[in-house]
Amino acid sequence: MFRSALVRSSASAKQSLLRRSFSSGSVPERKVAILGAAGGIGQPLALLMKLNPLVSSLSLYDIANTPGVAADVGHINTRSQVVGYMGDDNLAKALEGADLVIIPAGVPRKPGMTRDDLFNINAGIVKNLWSAIAKYCPHALVNMISNPVNSTVPIAAEIFKKAGMYDEKKLFGVTTLDVVRVKTSYAGKANVPVAEVNVPAIVGHAGVTILPLFSQATPQAILSGDALTVTTKRTQDGGTEVEEAKAGKGSATLSMAYAGALFADACLKGLNGVPDVVECSYVQSTITELPFFASKVRLGKNGVEEVLDLGPLSDFEKEGLEALRPGIKSTIEKGVKFANQ
């Protein structure tokens, strides 16, 4: 009974996803590469991308254990062909021909650590991967998950500039987990179905640099000042909440993989010409004086088609934005400095 119900549920979900995208006969060939595919985020992300009907080729790369992940995921009877690549010598093969590269590589957060505590380790890892991307698939869209995103995205931009291959429309910091978390929290506070909720999250992707825009939430509900503060803080502290709940034995891997898959799906839809695909992301931006900023962007065949204006902000949000500017500015500068050492 359970198996038949699961099959029916899976079939229904797959048909729904196909309807939201394209019919199976019109879907272009798309290669997606995941760098860090054997890690805590990479493995569930690989599973979710294997289930995505927009993916025709799934390339899984890591420094170890990738063949096992590829063999396991490869048994799933969906469209994409899966190949696992392991070690520096195979990075080029993993990247060649990729339309979309997703990077969850790096060490996870542990209790008591901030995203910036991860900087020295993860920045070095990301720097090497970006150099390879610039060489082997310079025209791919790249989704950065590795923390601290506020710094790793500027590092990537500088590396691409040095290689003469920088296109600001193709570089994304994945902040979708912030949006996922705030939707869940808002739905609980506003007592509305979470599936109907949309709440933008702007500025950055590190603790206090995350600012939900409840004034633009749909469906709209009036939250008290205390509720705004509590829900904002819970969104900002979401990673810490998971790490503490896992008692030091893990970080937010499953929810991050889900969020990463959502944003990757949006990027693929944009590449395939689906109109009006809008998501929040940390990108090069001119809507504030900060060179990188998380806000709503319209995705298209070239990546970022438009960085949307912030729209009207409440007094609470205006105050929050002003308070966050110095912190996000310093993390951007930290990334630029590291890339140019």
Swiss-Prot record:
Q: Binding positions for NAD(+)?
A: G36, A37, A38, G39, G40, I41, G42, D62, N122, I145, S146, N147, M256
Which InterPro entries does the entry link to?
A: L-lactate/malate_DH (IPR001557), Lactate/malate_DH_C (IPR022383), Lactate/malate_DH_N (IPR001236), Lactate_DH/Glyco_Ohase_4_C (IPR015955), Malate_DH_type1 (IPR010097), NAD(P)-bd_dom_sf (IPR036291)
- Could you say which enzyme class this protein belongs to? oxidoreductase
Q: Does the keyword Mitochondrion apply?
A: yes
Residue interval of the organelle targeting sequence:
1-22
- The residues that hold substrate are R109, R115, N147, R181
Q: Which GO terms describe its cellular component?
A: mitochondrial matrix
Q: Which domain of life is it from?
A: Eukaryota
Q: Which Gene3D superfamilies match?
A: Lactate dehydrogenase/glycoside hydrolase, family 4, C-terminal, NAD(P)-binding Rossmann-like Domain
Q: What coarse category fits the chief subcellular location reported for this protein?
A: mitochondrion
Enzyme Commission (EC) number: 1.1.1.37
GO term, biological process aspect, one? tricarboxylic acid cycle
Classification via NCBIfam families: MDH_euk_gproteo
Q: Which PANTHER family match?
A: MALATE AND LACTATE DEHYDROGENASE, MALATE DEHYDROGENASE 1, MITOCHONDRIAL-RELATED
Q: Which family does it belong to?
A: Belongs to the LDH/MDH superfamily. MDH type 1 family.
The subunit structure is: Homodimer.
Protein name as annotated: Malate dehydrogenase, mitochondrial
Species: Brassica napus (Rape)
Q: Which gene encodes it?
A: MDH
